[in-house]
Amino acid sequence: MPTVNQLVRKGRTSAAKKYKAPALHYSFNSLRNKVAFGDGSPQKRGVCTQVKTTTPKKPNSALRKIARVRLSNHMEVTAYIPGEGHNLQEHSVVLIRGGRVPDLPGVRYHIIRGTLDTAGVANRQQGRSRYGAKKGKAAPAKKK
């Protein structure tokens, strides 16, 4: 335990805050060719370098669609592609947000559907906002 004099001289140092989506907190300065740590962004744009499927941890079983994305801050991350079916391939430009996938280790980001090169989920009726799906055509009203 430190003495009062030691605390006066040095003081307490607070532990560094750990971020759940660290890639969103870095920005790239192209003039100085440096990456700087900042307040963070809600989303970041990136280019897909690889699109593939992977299997989840036990006890789950599936083929989850993921993409390796090189972000505008020159970092490369693994992002999950939500929804059924997608049109992504290498060199597709995507927008990512934070948010992990609990049964996929190392996947801390989600791709936002319905923006840039990512199409929304087709024929989705409920929870459309999360999947970039447009409102379906309403049935014509019957006349009496």
Curated annotation (Swiss-Prot):
Biased composition (Basic residues): 131-144
Domain of life the protein comes from: Bacteria
Region (Disordered): 125-144
Residues modified as 3-methylthioaspartic acid: D103
Single Gene Ontology MF annotation: tRNA binding
GO biological process: translation
Matching HAMAP family: Ribosomal_uS12_B
Family as reported in the entry's similarity comment: Belongs to the universal ribosomal protein uS12 family.
Function: With S4 and S5 plays an important role in translational accuracy.
Matches recorded under PANTHER family: 30S RIBOSOMAL PROTEIN S12 FAMILY MEMBER
The protein's assembly and partners: Part of the 30S ribosomal subunit. Contacts proteins S8 and S17. May interact with IF1 in the 30S initiation complex.
Protein name: Small ribosomal subunit protein uS12
Gene of this entry: rpsL
